Swiss-Prot record:
This is DNA polymerase III subunit alpha. Pfam families: DNA_pol3_alpha (PF07733), DNA_pol3_finger (PF17657), DNA_pol_IIIA_C (PF20914), HHH_6 (PF14579), PHP (PF02811), tRNA_anti-codon (PF01336). It is found in: Cytoplasm. The lineage of its organism: Bacteria, Pseudomonadati, Pseudomonadota, Gammaproteobacteria, Pasteurellales. SUPFAM superfamilies: PHP domain-like (SSF89550). Its EC number is 2.7.7.7. Belongs to the DNA polymerase type-C family. DnaE subfamily. InterPro entries: DNA_pol3_alpha_NTPase_dom, DNA_pol3_alpha_thumb_dom, DNA_pol3_finger, DNA_pol_IIIA_C, DnaE2/DnaE/PolC, DNAPol_HHH, NA-bd_OB-fold, NA-bd_OB_tRNA.
Length: 1159
């Protein structure tokens, strides 16, 4: 191979985010293909790609040069920032660039982060500076021809970076670039400055230029043809070959030679794959001994709880002691005692500070040491959970506890960790958003200037599934391939989108990842902050940050823990008033019969993980009656097991409809019974795979974990090796080789569906806790759940329906007793949370509750207005509170409150003015007009029920005092016998008929371009989504009117998207049509009170507008003398409309009018 002549020192990957589209791996491959011995990755103001670049480069035999392109400001250049390239000459330089990048983000920035030139002087050691070409400070001054300023600019680098400053030259066809090169070469000769050739690489190939321009336009929010779009780049900024660069700079050979010289000078060594933990304070003991001490103390406490009887405890102790010792030996030998102690401390702090912590998550629940240290709350021995699934001495990797915290307290825990280990030693982790399939189509389409409808049509052909790619979309949606093949514009758009798919678009914060450093985070990674310089995160993502040596801790927020806390707070407050002991959720029995009865009835709405329609169906079929069944439910309710048929095997075996075998009637072994008995012989868990390998073939559990992973990967060479090991081990244990391999094949088949039992058991415990709370404290539990959904009106509606089904009363919001959140009053009623009222913010609520706490309950509307700070509550807020029912106790009815609101506000305003003048007489202000107020109240007619309900729906999102459909329920039973809550999917060819209030409707277009109507029915027992296609839509579209009552017939099926049911409508009737079809007659009941001389004339006048119909009228008359039934003549027959019934009810009374049907 010939001697190298050039290397690229200034290259951007897609991690630059403002420009650059090349991925790190293809860049390294380009180096190898072009025989380049080194490469400098200099992404804009970040090291985000550094770890993978460093690793990939070394693996490929390419020397990695660490650097970054930065913006700098100086006194000389004023507010105009300039570009520099900083390269790390050694580890000191690497550390200094890390500090500089961190400082740029930490001080905040408006558009792009930048450095101060003074910082460069301060952190200059170990850094080589490339001048930034025509965009650098020297370049800008050269182009402007300011001799004195050129002198000053150069002097800075000669003073602070002697022998470490290079004038960078590039020839990419950019504006003023060639003039700069000429001036720079002259300056270099005059000042004795070295020059270096770069190509400012942004993409791999010349034909990637348009894709790059689109990427930049997406970032900058331009369209490609916008005349205002800055054109900063050219098609020459690709990864030029060595020969191309040599040809380009043949006239400046030193510029080429210096790339190699700089590459030789840059020698940074980064320690990857090691782990560095902060020192946990352990006093005089070593970290290992301290872990042993705390674990043994914790186990003793746990054993006293698990086995209160001393004899039983002593009998069980040896197996716990032995397991603990095995785990401690592994943890200490692998060097992880500090990790366990750190997690122990922040979890204990959380519990001490009333921040709920989950019982465990993931494989960590399989550790007895974790249980002893109270990191987890599930006894791993009781549920056959394996430590080796978490930490395997035969597969060295960091332990990884994912810890769930109450949503409200999670940030407090992270703050505590920062206080404990130092703010500079704790950071959250960056995460990167990429151009995903749907989004990249939309973005590219917008930049190319396509109409919204055109782009939307293509985007909607891409399935919304997580992890969807364009390649997967083409495989899943034939129409996408068809439109791609038939439309050149579509093809061009998709081809361009393919080039940009997966390109890093932006940076964000990882949901739960936190790193704790033994020193400063900046010893390992720069810090990236938001524009205000807050919320620091590492430049390395969750994988790279661990590879760089920092240990990741996952602090996850679980809403269910917050719900449990809120429920317990309400429960224990009530129990304290009653003189009863509090509920400790950690000590509830796991075999509560009442809880399992509720579970078997599938009444699991709001129960963690068990509330979806599909899960409810599985519960009905399984009829779980023990905690192990709940663990299995969590593991089985996934696409793989559901589609494989093993779920049905599990159900059939539980109910005796299939032989229980271990694992199969044809191929079983007695030694597997203890392993598979809890799951009726079905291999459900990964731990069972490991135990079978241990029991049948003599694997260590560590080796069995490797087998499990190999089965998951399905690599033929690995599986061939494992089959051999399994067969040999089984024969050595006296098991028939053929039988062993038959069982191996079965295990391999189910291993792909196997779930981590440790995670399933831990989450099953949370599920059970919510189930137990719903069973024994339903009001408090549902109030807590509704509080958690206060911002989601649709969810509140569903939960309210569930409360009605449970027999719980939900009282309207009450300004005198209610709280911001949902609560439970002394009558066991759930009181609607004031914070859930639309149009009422936290500020007004705080003002109202503060006034109530200071002066007691409000006597009336005038009293309230006089006592609250009206600067914090506007008129619209008061109106929302009246409409919602929150002020019902402040006046006779809502209409009166609404009418007198203006007077109450004026009186309050007058009171405030008088108080300011020293003439305060609140009671005078309020009582002077007391009689007038009473008169105003008395003279104000009540709102109709319809108006009241519309106000409730407007402010609460639901009907609380009643329901618009309530007056019709008796009548609707004649048209449809099935309530929505009782609906089940139809068999083929069958149809169901239901009725309800149409609460929403819309029209859409399918992927194939066909119209469909989508609507939602509500009959107060539940809700149902209905769809209308083709002929049905054409026939009934005009009847999909919101807030009307309709009767529909159609095919009912599961809705996989929502987890509920849906109906495809075949027939639809309005209420008037149903009456005309099914009603026999209209009954009018009269009494002596009605029979005024003018009554017949008035009744005829009322009925005349509705005459000409086919429904006959019967009059029932009752008096002291007797009763009779009279059929009115044909000329009296009417059309049975709602308006007619309303007028008759107003005239005769609601109970005097009724439809009659055939018996």
């Amino acid at each position: 191979m010939s001697e190298p002549r050039f290397v690229h020192l200034r290259v951007h990957s897609d991690f630059s985010m403002i420009n650059g589209i090349a991925k790190v791996k293809p860049l390294i491959k380009a180096c190898v293909d072009n025989h380049m011995v080194a490469m400098g990755l200099t992404d804009f103001t970040n090291f985000c790609g550094l770890v993978r670049f460093y690793g990939e480069a070394l693996s490929a035999g390419v020397k990695p040069i660490i650097g970054a392109d930065v913006l700098v400001r100086s006194e000389l250049c004023g507010d105009e920032p300039f570009e520099l390239t900083l390269l790390a000459k050694n580890n000191i330089g690497y550390h200094n660039i890390t500090l500089l990048l961190s400082k740029a983000y930490e001080r905040g920035y408006q558009d792009l982060p930048y450095l101060d030139q003074a910082w460069l002087a301060e952190h200059r050691e170990g850094i080589i500076v490339l001048s930034g070409g025509h965009n650098g400070d020297v370049g800008k001054k050269l182009l402007k021809g300011h001799a004195a300023e050129i002198e000053s600019a150069v002097a800075f680098y000669q003073d602070f970076f002697p022998d470490h400053f290079y004038l960078s030259l590039s020839r990419t066809g950019r504006y003023e670039e060639e003039r700069y090169v000429s001036l720079a070469l002259t300056l270099a000769e005059e000042k004795g400055l070295p020059v270096v050739a770069t190509n400012d690489v942004l993409f791999l190939h010349e034909d990637d230029f348009e894709a790059h321009e689109i990427r930049v336009a997406i970032h900058d929010s331009y369209t490609l043809d916008d005349p205002k779009r800055p054109k900063l780049y050219t098609n020459q900024q690709y990864f030029r070959s060595e020969q191309e660069m040599c040809d380009l700079f043949a006239d400046v050979p030193s510029a080429l030679e210096n790339t190699l010289l700089i590459a030789q000078r840059c020698n940074v060594t980064i320690r990857l794959g090691e782990y560095f933990l902060p020192q946990f304070p352990t006093g005089d003991l070593s970290t290992e001994d301290f872990l042993v001490k705390k674990s043994k103390e914790g186990l003793e406490e746990r054993l006293k709880f698990l086995f209160p009887d001393e004899k039983v405890r002593q009998a069980r102790r040896p197996e716990y002691d032995e397991r603990l010792q095995v785990e401690l030996d592994v943890i200490n030998q692998m060097g992880f005692p500090g990790y366990f102690l750190i997690v122990m401390e922040f979890i204990q702090w959380s519990k001490d500070n009333d921040i709920p912590v989950g019982p465990g998550r993931g494989s960590g629940a399989g550790s007895l040491v974790a249980y002893a240290l109270k990191i987890t709350d599930l006894d791993p021995l009781e549920f056959d959970l394996l430590f080796e699934r978490f930490l395997n001495p035969e597969r060295v990797s960091m332990p990884d506890f994912d810890v769930d915290f109450c949503m409200d307290g999670r940030d407090r825990v992270i703050d505590h960790v920062a206080e404990t280990y130092g703010r500079g030693a704790v950071s959250q982790i960056i995460t990167f958003g990429t151009m995903a399939a749907k989004a990249v189509i939309r973005d590219v389409g917008r930049v190319l200037g396509h109409p919204y409808g055109f782009v939307d049509r293509i985007s909607k052909l891409i399935p919304p599934d997580p992890g969807m790619t364009l390649a997967k979309a083409f495989a899943a949606e034939p129409q996408l391939q068809a439109v791609y093949d038939s439309d050149e514009e579509v093809k061009a758009l998709i081809d361009m989108a393919r080039k940009l798919e997966g390109v890093t678009r932006n940076a964000g914060k990882h949901a739960g990842g936190v790193v704790i450093s033994p020193g400063l985070i900046t010893d390992f990674s720069p810090l990236y902050c938001d524009s205000e310089g807050k919320h620091p995160v590492t430049h390395f993502d969750k994988n790279d940050v661990e590879y760089a040596g920092l240990v990741k801790f996952d602090f996850l927020g679980l809403r269910t823990l917050t719900i449990i806390k809120w429920a317990l707070d309400m429960i224990n407050t009530r129990l304290a008033k009653e003189g009863k002991p509090p509920v400790d959720i950690a000590t509830i029995p796991l075999d509560d019969p009442a809880s399992f009865e509720l579970l078997k009835r599938s009444e699991t709405t709001a129960v963690f993980q068990l509330e979806s329609r599909g899960m409810k169906d599985l519960i009905k079929r399984l009829q779980p009656d023990c905690f192990e069944d709940i663990i299995a439910l969590v593991a089985l309710f996934r696409p793989g097991p559901l589609e494989s048929g093993m779920v049905q095997n599990f159900i059939d075996r539980k109910h005796g409809n299939e032989v229980v075998a271990y694992p199969d009637p044809e191929y079983q072994h007695d030694s597997l019974k203890p392993i598979l008995e809890p799951t009726y012989g079905v291999i459900v868990y990964q731990e069972q795979v490991m135990q079978i390998a241990q029991e049948l073939a003599g694997y260590t559990l560590g080796g069995a974990d490797l087998l499990r992973r190999a089965m998951g990967k399905k690599k033929p060479e690995e599986m061939a090796a494992q089959r051999e090991i399994f067969e040999k081990g089984a024969i050595q244990k006296g098991v028939d080789g053929e039988l062993a391999m038959k069982i191996f094949d079965l295990v391999e088949k189910f291993a792909g569906y196997g779930f981590n039992k440790s995670h399933s058991a831990a989450y099953a415990l949370v599920s059970y806790q919510t189930l137990w709370l719903k069973t024994h404290y339903p009001a408090e539990f549902m109030a807590a759940v509704m509080t958690s959904e206060m911002d989601n009106t649709d969810k509140i509606v569903g939960l309210y329906d569930e409360c009605l089904r449970m027999g719980l009363k939900v009282a309207p919001p009450d300004i005198n007793t209610g709280k911001h959140h949902f609560s439970v009053n002394e009558y066991g009623e759930i009181v609607y949370g004031i914070g859930a009222i639309k149009g009422v913010g936290e500020g007004p609520i705080e003002a109202l509750i503060s006034a109530r706490e200071q002066g007691g309950i409000f006597k009336d509307l005038f009293d309230l207005c006089a006592r609250v700070d009206l600067k914090k509550i506007n008129r619209r807020t008061f109106e929302s509170l009246i409409l919602s029912g929150a002020f019902d106790k402040l006046g006779p009815h809502r209409a009166a409150l609404s009418k007198n609101l203006e007077d109450a506000l004026k009186a309050s305003d007058q009171h405030a003015k008088d108080a300011a003048m020293g003439q305060a007489d609140m009671f005078g202000v309020l009582t002077e007009s007391h009689e007038d107020v009473e008169k105003a109240y008395a003279s104000t007619p009540r709102w109709s029920e319809k108006v009241i309900l519309e106000g409730e729906r407007e402010t609460l999102g639901l009907y609380l005092s009643s329901h618009p459909i309530s007056p019709y329920l008796k009548e609707l039973a004649h048209y449809s016998a099935t309530r929505l809550k009782d609906l089940v999917p139809n068999s083929r060819g069958q149809m169901s008929t239901v009725s309800g209030l149409l609460v929403s409707s819309r029209f859409a277009v399918t992927k194939k371009g066909n119209r469909l109507g989508i609507a939602t029915l509500d009959d107060r027992s539940g809700r149902l989504d209905i769809t209308l296609f083709g002929e049905a839509l054409d026939k009934y579209a005009d009847k999909l009117q919101k807030d009307t009552v309709i009767i529909v017939s159609g095919q009912v099926s599961f809705d996989e998207f929502s987890g509920g049911l849906k109906m495809s409508v075949r027939e639809l009737m309005s209420l008037d049509e149903a009456r005309s079809r099914y009603a026999k007659s209209l009954a009018i009941c009269l009494s002596e009170e009605n029979m005024k001389p003018t009554f017949i004339r008035e009744l005829k006048a009322l009925l005349t507008p509705y005459s000409g119909g086919t429904l006959p009228i019967y009059v029932y008359y009752a008096s002291t003398a007797g009763q009779c039934r009279v059929k009115m003549g044909v000329q009296w027959s009417v059309n049975p409309t709602d308006q007619l019934f309303t007028e008759l009810a107003e005239k005769l009374g609601e109970n005097a009018v009724e439809l009659e049907f055939q018996s």
